[in-house]
């Protein structure tokens, strides 16, 4: 595809989604397109405004907020969408690539499409609000129904609706031929290598390797040589949607059968609550805070056997960023995320799918897996899936096949 002479505007109101926006925009630039990024001057994680400047970027003066779920945050998103719409009217781009949420951006995109019908409109849905907040009763409340419709009622305006996972497509009203899935890619870390077992079996077979002994794992036992300890990693924000009670309950049950230790890489408003609940059940843990250096993260993960990927029941998520890190570093999953992740765990046999009504059975399954001698093979399988599904190259292939062709051919 030759993008020479084409103008693309990439819009996101969330600093958390900027890596996706920057990556997509750079792909367009590589094709010769002129790219403008419209982003925010408010840093979501830190809850502060910053003076920002970069070539080919416009930073919208964004209304600050303190709470993630608040009327002020919704107003901030509405105000951002209104200002972004004015910028788009002036730019007259060949393509507008909008990252959702905010849901109010979908409404703005619809209005832009009506005014400039020759513009290609792409929505890239990275989260579902309010569905990802969980709670069936909550979803039925009138304000939340309006919030959801702010997105759903305007999806039909898009020439293409991208979702971050297949699971999201069950909840949106978009024609299948106008949808695509682009997983959030993770760049292959510097120095990364696959852990290939010596007697790797064909991919359609489940190999049985020699069991790892306690002495072989002595370096990951955090000072404990006997009995052996099963080390778990939890990576990511410690917020109101992670299943703290489920994680603690599972570790408590498992801990009655064998010693356990939890490594927590992340931070958030519920860190104190998480620490208290672990301590109350006698579960040993270490909190490292937010870690962004891949080498540090890799070193922590090298001490762990499993990665915990659990959110509260009802939260509408099919794939998490933490799970992609687990795939990258080959940590078998303790998972309760439905959709894409649940099916991968089930079909590829790369961990256990946790069910709260069968917590004891799940703990027994995990212990059997830990003692099966299959961990090395599962690590290799997970890293193979990472290379196939979650690298930048894998995501770029979809962008080339679906998005670049739209830019070249115009609206459908």
Regions found by a protein language model. Give the residues of each.
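A short, active-site helix/loop in glycosyltransferases that binds the activated sugar's phosphate group
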Residues: 148-181, 188-193, 343
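Nucleotide-sugar-dependent
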Residues: 19, 242, 288, 293-300, ...
């Amino acid at each position: 595809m030759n993008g020479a002479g084409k103008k693309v505007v990439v819009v996101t109101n969330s600093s958390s989604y900027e890596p996706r926006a920057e990556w997509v925009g750079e792909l367009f630039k590589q094709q010769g397109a002129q790219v403008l990024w419209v982003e925010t001057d408010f840093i979501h994680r830190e809850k502060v405004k910053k003076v920002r400047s970069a070539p080919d970027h416009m930073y919208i003066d964004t209304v600050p907020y303190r709470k993630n779920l608040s009327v002020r945050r919704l107003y901030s998103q509405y105000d951002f969408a209104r200002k972004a719409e004015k910028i788009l009217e002036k730019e007259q781009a060949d393509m507008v690539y909008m990252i959702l949420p905010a849901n109010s951006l979908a409404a703005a995109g619809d209005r832009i499409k009506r005014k400039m019908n020759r513009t290609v409109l792409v929505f890239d849905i990275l989260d579902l609000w309010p569905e990802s907040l969980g709670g069936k009763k909550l979803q039925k409340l009138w304000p939340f129904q309006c919030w959801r419709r702010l997105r759903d009622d305007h999806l039909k305006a898009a020439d293409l609706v991208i979702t971050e996972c297949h699971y999201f497509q069950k909840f949106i009203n978009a024609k299948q031929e106008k949808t695509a899935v682009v997983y959030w890619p993770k760049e292959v870390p510097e120095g990364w290598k696959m852990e290939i077992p010596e007697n790797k079996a064909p991919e359609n077979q489940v190999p049985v390797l020699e069991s790892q002994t306690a002495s072989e794992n002595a370096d990951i036992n955090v000072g404990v040589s006997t009995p052996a300890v099963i080390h778990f990693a939890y990576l990511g924000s410690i917020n109101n949607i992670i299943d703290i009670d489920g994680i603690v309950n599972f570790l408590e049950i498992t801990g009655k059968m064998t010693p356990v230790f939890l490594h927590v890489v992340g931070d958030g408003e519920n860190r104190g609550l998480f620490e208290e609940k672990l301590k109350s059940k006698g579960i040993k843990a270490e909190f490292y805070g937010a870690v962004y250096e891949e080498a540090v993260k890799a070193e922590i993960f090298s001490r762990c056997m499993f990665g915990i990927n659990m959110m509260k029941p009802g939260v509408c998520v099919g794939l998490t960023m933490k799970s992609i890190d687990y795939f990258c570093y080959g940590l078998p999953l303790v998972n309760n995320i439905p959709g894409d992740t649940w099916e991968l765990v089930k079909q590829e046999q790369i961990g256990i799918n946790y069910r709260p009504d069968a917590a004891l059975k799940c703990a027994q399954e995990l212990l059997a897996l830990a003692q099966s001698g299959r961990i090395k093979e599962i690590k290799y399988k997970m890293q193979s899936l990472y290379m196939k599904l979650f690298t930048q190259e894998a995501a770029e292939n979809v962008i080339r096949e679906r998005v670049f062709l739209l830019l070249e051919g115009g609206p459908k």
